Amino acid sequence: MSEQQVQELEKKWYALQVEPGKENEAKENLLKVLELEGLKDLVDEVIVPAEEKVVIRAQGKEKYRLSLKGNARDISVLGKKGVTTFRIENGEVKVVESVEGDTCVNAPPISKPGQKITCKENKTEAKIVLDNKIFPGYILIKAHMNDKLLMAIEKTPHVFRPVMVGGKPVPLKEEEVQNILNQIKRGVKPSKVEFEKGDQVRVIEGPFMNFTGTVEEVHPEKRKLTVMISIFGRMTPVELDFDQVEKI
């Protein structure tokens, strides 16, 4: 396909249904399939509608959860042997100072959800995660939708299908897409806390999927819950993200 033909293709935004909790894996898998199938020219962009956050941990405990966007800043945490300083800048995270020296400082910077930097001896870590998902279970694609692309989408791991009406993919309205993109650009505002101590919940993703339990503690600043779940006949506290459970 010539460059002129590619430019003439009409591309619209579509919502793709994906496996909940696997939104980023679905995106990465789709990009690989597009490359293998030679269909990259049909697609302008694939995004997960969520905010990218940096989670910084020290000695096994979460210390900070910060936006990957915004002004450059250095974050220092005290690990097992001393201080590790992470720098968040231009959409990347790297180590600028560590008690471990060059071993950790020279680690490659990270910039994508799922990537992490670990200073093993000092037990400190920075990881990029997707937080405050606008539409859990969906990713967005700007593409010229045709039969070849539809077949590629449907055979991609963790991706199900586009939102359809009458058996045909339905493009999103431009104003809807702009609202979503603006939310991501500004930083998604956390939704109100919908859980309280004593709520009965069902786990909908992760290793405890389909287990039920009772909310013991709510941590709104981290968007996490401590849920008491019966495991092998014993009530066990399990820490879960808000997105991993639903009320019953």
UniProtKB/Swiss-Prot annotation:
One term under GO cellular component: cytosol
Residue span, KOW domain: 197-227
One of the GO BP terms on file: DNA-templated transcription termination
Alphabetic keyword roster: Transcription, Transcription antitermination, Transcription regulation, Transcription termination
Cross-referenced InterPro entries: KOW (IPR005824), NGN (IPR047050), NGN-like_dom (IPR006645), NGN_dom_sf (IPR036735), NusG-like (IPR043425), NusG_2_sf (IPR038690), NusG_dom2 (IPR024045), Rib_uL2_dom2 (IPR014722)
Keyword Plastid among UniProt keywords: no
Pfam families with a match to the protein in the record: KOW, NusG, NusG_II
Key word Transcription present: yes
Cited SUPFAM superfamilies: N-utilization substance G protein NusG, insert domain, N-utilization substance G protein NusG, N-terminal domain, Translation proteins SH3-like domain
Family: Belongs to the NusG family.
General function of this protein: Participates in transcription elongation, termination and antitermination.
Domain notes from UniProt: Contains an N-terminal RNP-like domain, a C-terminal element with a KOW sequence motif and a species-specific immunoglobulin-like fold.
HAMAP family: NusG
Complex and partners: Monomer. Homodimer.
Protein name: Transcription termination/antitermination protein NusG
